[in-house]
Swiss-Prot record:
Organism in which the protein naturally occurs: Clostridium kluyveri (strain ATCC 8527 / DSM 555 / NBRC 12016 / NCIMB 10680 / K1)
Residues given in the record as L-glutamine binding sites: 66, 210
Protein family: Belongs to the class-I aminoacyl-tRNA synthetase family.
Catalytic activity: tRNA(Gln) + L-glutamine + ATP = L-glutaminyl-tRNA(Gln) + AMP + diphosphate
Intervals of motif 'KMSKS' region: 266-270
Protein name: Glutamine--tRNA ligase
Residues engaged in binding ATP: 34-36, 40-46, 229, 259-260, 267-269
Gene: glnS
Length: 556
């Protein structure tokens, strides 16, 4: 699907009108992550939106790091975010850091002080919260609100020069403590933080608040359309106030859209961190995580994520997207690209008693039956093979076409075999089958034309390559993420989200490279886990099942 879906028209219409009216000559968008964690599928929606709009309107897009909170930020996150954006298939026009503008932001703060639009306040964080009031009760003015300009300037200089402790003073905007919008009740613009910054070191001990820094960053960079999620809608009056009162010529426009919400998925950074810290997963790139790193390790393709984000579009109305929709686009991508191979997840040994001992032959099997250009591979076959345990039943129900005593099945691209005996252990479990084969059925068809309903995949015992195979289910059982349930959400963590089995794959798979993807015949799509496959030991992650009943909603 392309980018021109109806649900994103409201943003495009705004941009079109802005260009027509001459308000802006060129479109500049930005993706502005804070480098304090890893990107997730919700960020991917914003990335695709901003880069696609810039591309459609022949504009530019900035990758900007909102690095104004040194205690939580790290170069590690900067590099991982850059890698994720590139992996998704995008190249930014300008790489920017909020910290590069600290001097200019300080100058704008001084400008507001001299205009009488900002003041230094000595109230504690708790007192500021108390003075702010509520949605139904107006706030009350700080006792420090009417300090004169000279005193405010000297105190702010002192804050900058390290004369005060963390939390001892803040710089606040002087707006309206009775405003119905709580964000306009003298918000904090600067706070003291004696913390080393990943980019500026120890040069600064005061740092701008997000609501002050963000509009300034957009204006400084010449951003025209600052696209963000709906939780910032109530912050837009403050965004516009900062631009206006700082008297900046460039006037970016903030536009809000609904954030991505998905079934069986949490995207709160706090909740994701809790999953990592409490060892529900093995890191931020765990294949069950909705992070870009996790999706990548799981085997998702950049194209499938881009197509998903385009298909869901953007709107003002919040909604829940079925997580199966993401799987739909992934499956659609892998169906075309992934080579086919056979893998046995729960091995049951089969001895073909009338097959010559010591003989090995090979069968040519297509890598993709829908794409002749994918070529063929040679697969060895001999007297002993593995099939899946679930492909045999001693006492099957009606219309069971797989293997059972006396029944004949087709081995994919090989021979017909018939079960003659089931060998059991002392507990009565079937541990081995005895079968005979029909030499005339070579290639999987019999010259006498007899029909065989069941076709089984198999692997030659002598050349089988051991593999650990990881089968994933949704990490979160709750359909919808609920705000403010930081602890309760753990009650919905799926204890069976990972199942590990020891199986076998074809001999050619020993040469597989990290992140290569395959369709395991009848099992689904799998990828080699490059992080865990070491010293010749292969680990495969199931990316997604072969089929699903999910269909794209008509309005998409």
């Amino acid at each position: 699907m392309g980018d021109n879906n109806n649900s994103s028209n409201f943003i495009k219409n705004i941009i079109i009108e802005d260009l027509k009216s001459g308000e802006y000559e060129k479109v500049v968008t930005r993706f502005p992550p804070e480098p304090n964690g890893y990107l997730h599928i919700g960020h991917a929606k914003s990335i695709v939106l901003n880069f696609s709009l810039a591309d459609e309107f022949e504009g530019k897009v900035n990758l900007r790091f909102d690095d104004t909170n040194p205690s939580k930020e790290d170069v590690e996150y900067v590099e991982s975010i850059k890698e994720d954006v590139k992996w998704l298939g995008y190249n930014w026009d300008n790489l920017c850091f909020a910290s590069s503008y600290f001097e200019r932001m300080y100058e704008y703060a001084v400008f507001l002080i001299k205009k009488g639009k900002a003041y230094v306040c000595d109230l504690t964080a708790d007192e500021i919260r108390e003075y702010r009031g509520t949605l139904t009760k107006p706030g009350k003015e700080s006792p420090y609100r009417n300090r004169d300009v000279e005193e405010n300037f000297k105190l702010f200089e002192g804050m900058k020069n390290g004369e005060f402790k963390d939390g001892e003073k803040v710089l606040r905007a002087k707006i309206d403590m009775a405003s119905p919008n709580i964000n306009m009740r003298d918000p904090v613009l600067y706070r003291i933080a004696h913390a080393s910054h990943h980019n500026t070191g120890d040069r600064w001990c005061i740092y701008p608040m997000y609501d002050f820094a963000h509009p300034l960053e957009d204006a400084i960079e010449g951003v025209t359309h600052s696209i963000c999620t709906l939780e910032f809608e109530d912050h837009r009056p403050l965004y516009d106030w900062i631009i206006q009162e700082c008297e900046i010529e460039n006037r970016p426009k903030q536009i809000e859209f609904a954030r991505l919400n998905m079934t069986n998925t949490v995207m709160s950074k706090r909740k994701l961190k809790q999953l990592v810290d409490e060892n529900f997963v093995d890191g931020w790139d765990d294949p069950r995580m909705p992070t870009i790193a996790g999706l990548r390790r799981r085997g998702f393709t950049p194209e499938s994520i881009r197509n998903f984000c385009r298909a869901i579009g953007v709107s003002k109305a919040s909604s829940i997207v079925d997580s199966q929709m993401l799987d739909y686009f992934l499956r659609d991508d892998l169906e075309k690209e992934a080579p086919r191979t056979m893998a046995i997840l729960n091995p049951l040994k089969v001895v073909i008693t009338n097959y010559p001992e010591g003989k090995t032959e090979t069968f040519k099997i297509e890598n993709n039956p829908d794409d002749a250009s994918a070529g063929v591979r040679e697969v060895p076959f001999s007297r002993e093979i593995y099939i899946e345990q679930e492909d045999f039943m001693e006492n099957p129900p009606k219309k069971y076409y797989r293997l059972f005593p006396g029944n004949e099945v087709r081995l994919k691209s090989a021979y017909f075999i018939k079960c003659t005996e089931a060998i059991k252990d002392k507990d009565g479990n079937v541990i081995e089958l005895r079968c005979t084969y029909d030499p005339a059925s070579k290639g999987g068809n019999s010259p006498d034309g007899r029909k065989v309903r069941g076709t089984l995949h198999w692997i030659n015992v002598d050349t089988a390559i051991p593999a650990e195979i990881r089968l994933y289910e949704p990490l979160i059982l709750e359909q919808q993420e609920k705000e403010g349930e930081e602890d309760l959400f753990l009650d919905h963590v799926n204890p069976n989200s990972l199942k590990v089995v020891k199986g076998f794959v074809e001999p050619d798979m020993k040469h597989v490279k990290s992140d290569e993807k395959f369709q395991f015949f009848r099992h689904g799509y799998f990828v080699l886990d490059g992080k865990c496959s070491k010293n010749g030991e292969l680990v495969f992650n199931r990316i997604v099942s072969l089929k699903s009943s999910f269909k794209i909603p008509e309005n998409k």
